[in-house]
Each structure stands twice: as structure tokens, then as C-alpha cells.
Curated annotation (Swiss-Prot):
Pathway the protein acts in: Phospholipid metabolism; phosphatidylethanolamine biosynthesis; phosphatidylethanolamine from CDP-diacylglycerol: step 2/2
Pyruvic acid (Ser) sites (modified residues): 247
UniProt-listed GO biological process terms: phosphatidylethanolamine biosynthetic process
Catalytic activity: a 1,2-diacyl-sn-glycero-3-phospho-L-serine + H(+) = a 1,2-diacyl-sn-glycero-3-phosphoethanolamine + CO2
Domain of life: Bacteria
Subunit structure: Heterodimer of a large membrane-associated beta subunit and a small pyruvoyl-containing alpha subunit.
Role summary: Catalyzes the formation of phosphatidylethanolamine (PtdEtn) from phosphatidylserine (PtdSer).
Keyword Lipid biosynthesis: yes
Species of the source: Xanthomonas axonopodis pv. citri (strain 306)
Protein's name according to its UniProt entry: Phosphatidylserine decarboxylase proenzyme
Length: 280
């Protein structure tokens, strides 16, 4: 285990993330520009596809980090049976949900019930498929809909804020089921679909298109919001949320619905809108 990963066990996760949020929203010109320039240089951020390509035009670091893309920079797969990749990034893992468990890395797994915070909510995904997509600091940080769905419920599951970088994924047991996360349950024409936005060290929040910034007060209780009957319908490929720093999204599909694209594997670089799976 690397020194950085070892340190994440003892670091004050929430304090650091609160400080990161304050910096991310700072409008002090020297502060925000130093952050933008540092991240652009360190991670090789490409602004040529951004709707605003001038790094000096963003009022805050967060505005830069959650930047929009130019129209047409990403297009959905033309096959109507394609279940779409929800974000730019890299496949951490994908595959079947076997015996209710989701593979994290060699020797590491966690249950769907742990991830979703609910045994009953996890049951429909047993023997289904999952995909875990890691968004690095250089990536486009908006998450989109794999398929058209009606929002049924969101569940805020409190937890730690470990790094979700590759070393942590390999070494921290049950990482994604331990970090703070926002579970979004959708009803679709093929049944339930879940998109899980996993927080991480320095992630200052998740912002959804239906309720804005989701930064619940820290606590040890799961918080649910019921959206049934409220008509929150999001079309396939539409934006659903954005990370206010890099992290991970996990998509769960029920069994017998779709087959994962054969060209995908762990460590594959992916782009929003390409085929994640195809309807059976």
C-alpha cells in the first residue's frame, strides 16, 4: 500500500473536503487561477472541447471543473439498443453482480446491498450487471443518463471520504461501499436502474439537475428523498448530475436486460455516450 493510501486512513477526510470546497468556490482571482493553472498543468486538462476554452474566463475553480462541453463534443451511440456510458473516464471494473456481490479489484468486493444501503433495493440487481467508471481530475465531470428513466428515490449514504484513485481501489477493502455516496434510483421501461455517485477525498459535493447541490449535513443516518409522483423524467444521454471534483459513478442494471459491450474491460478509457451495454 502506498504512503498516500496509508495516510488516507488517518487524514481528517471531512475537514480536508470542507477546505477543498471553500477553495473551489473562492472568487479571489489569484486563488482560483492558481488552482485552475495547477490542475490543468498537472493532469493535462484539454480545454479544446470545452464550451469556454479560456481558462481565465471561469469565475471559480468549481466552474472550471464542472465546465460544459461544446455542442456535439459528445454524441450518443446511434444504436437505439445501446445503454450509454454515463461519463468520460476509465473503467475501474465491470461485470456481473454475482451472489449479490460487486467486484472491486483482485481480492476485493462488496455487496450491492452495502453500496445501495438497502437489501430490498439491491435484490432486483442480483445476477444483473454493473460498471464502475472513475473520473480523473482531467475529465469532463458531468454524469449523464445511460437510459431514459423516471427518478424514484435518492438515498444519501454517509461514510468516509477515501481517495478513489487506482491504488486505493486495489488496497482499501469495500472502498465504494464505505465512502459517502448518493444513490439515484430510476424506473425505466426495462425495470429499475441505479446510478451511484461516490464521493472521495477532496470531493466537495454532488450537484443534481433536479435539486441542485447535494451536500447533506454530516451524520450517521441514511437520508432518503422520495420523488415518486413528482415527474422527474430524464431522457437517455441527458445530464443528471455533476461532481464538484473527480470521483466515481457506478451503474447497476437488472438481469436479462442488457449485455455489456465486449470491447470494454478494466482500465479501458471511455467517453460519455459510447455503448456501455446493449439491450437483449
Amino acid at each position: 500500500m502506498s504512503l498516500v493510501t496509508s495516510l488516507t486512513y488517518v487524514l481528517p477526510h471531512r475537514l480536508l473536503s470542507s477546505l477543498a470546497r471553500a477553495l473551489a468556490y473562492s472568487q479571489t482571482p489569484s486563488t482560483k487561477q492558481w488552482l485552475i493553472d495547477t490542475v490543468t498543468r498537472k493532469f493535462g486538462v484539454d480545454l479544446s472541447e470545452a464550451q469556454e476554452p479560456d481558462p481565465h474566463a471561469y469565475p471559480t475553480f468549481n466552474a472550471f471543473f464542472t465546465r460544459a462541453l461544446k455542442p456535439g463534443a459528445r454524441v450518443p451511440d446511434a444504436d437505439p439498443s445501446a445503454v450509454l456510458m454515463p461519463a468520460d473516464g476509465r473503467i475501474s471494473q465491470l461485470g456481473p453482480v454475482e451472489n449479490g456481490r460487486i467486484f472491486q479489484a483482485k481480492g476485493q468486493s462488496f455487496t450491492a446491498a452495502e453500496l445501495l444501503g438497502d437489501e430490498a433495493a439491491a435484490a432486483p440487481f442480483n445476477d444483473g450487471v454493473f460498471a464502475t467508471v472513475y473520473l480523473s481530475p482531467k475529465d469532463y465531470h458531468r454524469v449523464h443518463m445511460p437510459w431514459t428513466g423516471t427518478l424514484r428515490e435518492t438515498v444519501h449514504v454517509p461514510g468516509r471520504l477515501f481517495s478513489v484513485g487506482p491504488d486505493a481501489v486495489r488496497k482499501v477493502p469495500r472502498l465504494f461501499a464505505r465512502n459517502e455516496r448518493l444513490v439515484c434510483h430510476f424506473d425505466t421501461e426495462f425495470g429499475p436502474m441505479a446510478s451511484v455517485m461516490v464521493g472521495a477525498l477532496l470531493v466537495s459535493g454532488v450537484e443534481t439537475v433536479w435539486s441542485g447541490v447535494e451536500i447533506p449535513r454530516y451524520g450517521d443516518r441514511i437520508t432518503r428523498k422520495d420523488y415518486r409522483g413528482k415527474g422527474v423524467v430524464l431522457e437517455k444521454f441527458a445530464e443528471m448530475a455533476r461532481f464538484n471534483y473527480g470521483s466515481t459513478v457506478i451503474v447497476l442494471l437488472p438481469p436479462g436486460v442488457a449485455t455489456l459491450d465486449g470491447g470494454l474491460a478494466a482500465e479501458t478509457s471511455v467517453r460519455l455516450g459510447q455503448a456501455l451495454a446493449r439491450r437483449q
